Amino acid sequence: MKYAWIDKQREFPLTEVCAILDVSVSGYRSWQRGGRPNRKRLTDIQMLALIQSIHAELKGIYGSPRMVRELRDRGFPASKERVERLMRENDIRARHKRRYKVTTDSKHNLPIAPNLLDRNFNPAAPNQVWTSDITYLWTDEGWLYLAIVLDLFNREIVGWSLKPRMTTDIVTDALTMAWFRKRPAAGLMHHSDRGSQYASHAFQRALEKYGMICSMSRKGNCWDNAPTESWFNSFKNERVHGLRYETRAEMTAMSFEYIEVLYNRKRQHSSLGYKSPIRFLDDWLITQQKEKLVA
């Protein structure tokens, strides 16, 4: 009996064991309860209270499609129509996105790399293509600049850096964090815009040191780095616009919480089948392991 065997494997993560045996976690939980259902159907008042609680907890980042999946993940299945109705009737909405603004300076005489990525935003495996960009964040103490490195495979932020000035250090620090975290093999493609920070000799030396291939967007074409710019739009929409940060330390703490706690590990991503980046990667790795065992 698969469920009885799973019950003995306490040293391994439950989700991984269930995935290897092709059974659902919910099915295993039901077996533990003797086949009894987990919860009765919630009333509209109870469901609304739960939706409002999640909306407040996640600071309004989810519309109805993601809310349906979040409820399901928490053990409260509900139809898309029901969640849409409750959110509409009670004016519960996701925060609206704003247009992206360019922050890097591409007016320089430094060498420019060709656009090798060419908008191929769906690599077949992790650590094949990383993309980078910089954005600005205002606090009462002054500006902060955030540089990120994003793995296109699972949209995970693998490296990031916050500094009060937009110098070359900000992008090299983000790249260094990403490299030490993932240790990718030589040949990884790194894509960015033509900003002077990315074209600088220091950053190009860092790429060469890590065995990475440089790719840059075409002049004035934001769509060549669309996934990274989209991430900044979501980040600012969900954590910056309409909010006040008194100190740089407060902004830094918020950025850490958003990237490392919420986005990478919890936030559903529509292009990943409404999984978080790390969950998507974990599921992919489990699938790879199963295929190796079969082979």
Locations of regions flagged by a protein language model:
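Charged DNA-binding/catalytic regions of mobile-element recombinases
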Residues: 1-295
